[in-house]
């Protein structure tokens, strides 16, 4: 056999089975804190092994990975941002998450750049380009994994991982476009944020009005389609596309507080709440499906025979150590009270893979390759598992009273 020639019925059967397996993996993840993405990647690796063993080729399967990942990133960040509240009392949490994402990102990029420069003798600019994708927290993995945590810790994880994605993409795009980095890019960055927020606010308001008027039963894919268009246009002109997605979700979920008063009075907030619930459900279902096949395909790109090199695991372990030492030090200094589990919730995943695949060939490193990325990805997930297992959710006053009552009744 020189190519995969499978009947349509078998393809449909396989897609259905894989979707059900992913659903079961998600259920398992909620019970055991074991990330479902590891199992999805493993299935992809096994399928690649089967194809290579039987001499099968796989056409465009690898080529669609970046597109699938971009759509998944849009949906996951949108889903997470629509769950957030921007009430006044949330501002300290938002700023804490923003500074955490920014400071940890800059410190990690600096440390990894110096590590690659001195240890692997890579050029400084190439070291920085390869360090940035490894320094970003993947919201696509962190957000679904925070479901079992307290509301405050979950909100911090959603904000921090989303900010990390946004800052990382902006930094990566500007690093690619500006060699060397110039001071004026920071002014450009500030102007870019203002423009992105203004455009997103306008689009959010227009979509709210349009959704109210649409009577057709199929209407909730419209805002997703608009976001995909905005994301693609943003990528073409090198502006923060992910910030558009994140701020769009915030504007939709917090129209009463984020819209200026002269816009707010034209919004039907009750109808918007109904539309928002439907949009959240559609986004969550779609994100689940896209995420499933993205990580399956990522596993499919891995060749097992390349994983036998011990140095790959050594480099991966060193990178993970740098990432989490910096994270622990910052959170310990900046946070009062417990820093568990959030100190362990810094997974690598979808966004890291997407940025890594977009590094131009002349800036790619033969040392920091996709196999090192996979090892960092897996190590970070196991640390996240440890964080989830070691953290115990505080009991509510009602639960304590009920337990005391049960004990008293036995005396």
PLM features per residue range, with description:
Residues 1-411:
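Transmembrane helical cores of multi-pass secondary ion antiporters/exchangers
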